Regions:
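Short-chain dehydrogenase/reductase
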Residues: 1-8, 35-42, 65-66, 114
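Active-site Tyr-X1-5-Lys
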Residues: 1-23, 49-50
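Hydrophobic alpha-helix immediately C-terminal to the catalytic Tyr-X-X-X-Lys motif of short-chain
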Residues: 6, 10, 14, 44, ...
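Short, hinge-like loop/turn segments at secondary-structure boundaries
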Residues: 41-43, 151-152
Length: 183
């Protein structure tokens, strides 16, 4: 999280100092085909399929804003060809953290609907047709209990709305995972 925040600050500084239009996107828990094997959903799928114990942190009490890859791509495509502009209504005493007087902008790309991690795991079990075994563990240092994107500015500026229901996205992920790993 610290590196992401410092990246945004550096982008803002360049935009401000050199009047360079810069747009950043914040992606929220991206999942789908070609997901990395070290990410939670692929670990859960692998564990359920292979009867391995699933490590579930924060005793399963996490909430995440899962965003299907197609929705992420659509969101990025909406903003990529529109350079950021200065916000002439920006007021330093009550700043809008997503804009400034510099040509700089930040957009959240997410589903806008945090889901309980255990609901996601149970949905994976339903799709696979098999129950998983769990090892519930405390929250890892530096982790957060919940992520939740506010995509209202992206919706307002670019008419963006995520369109993939999470159950459909999970079905596509499991289908891809089985095809990729088992032929």
């Amino acid at each position: 999280a610290a590196t992401k925040a410092s990246n945004e600050l550096m982008a803002f500084s360049y935009s401000h100092l050199f009047n360079i239009p810069l747009t950043g996107v914040r992606l929220f828990t991206v999942y789908g085909p070609w997901d990395r094997p070290d990410m939670a959903l692929c670990k859960f799928i692998n564990g359920i399929l292979n009867d391995q114990e699933l490590q579930v942190f924060n005793f399963g009490n996490h909430r995440r804003d899962f965003t299907y890859i197609d929705d992420v791509v659509n969101g990025v495509l909406k903003v990529i060809n529109t350079p950021a502009r200065s916000n002439n209504d920006w007021i330093g005493e009550i700043p809008d953290p997503g804009t400034s007087q510099s040509p700089w902008r930040i957009y959240n790309i997410g589903s806008g609907e945090p889901l309980d991690l255990m609901d996601i795991i149970h949905e994976l079990e339903r799709i696979i047709g098999k129950k998983g075994r769990y090892q519930f563990l405390p929250m890892q240092p530096g982790d957060v209990h919940e992520t939740h994107s506010d995509v209202s500015v992206l919706a307002q500026d670019f008419d963006f709305q995520p369109t993939t229901p999470y159950k459909l996205g999970l079905e596509k992920l499991v289908e891809w995972y089985k095809r990729y790993h088992f032929g």
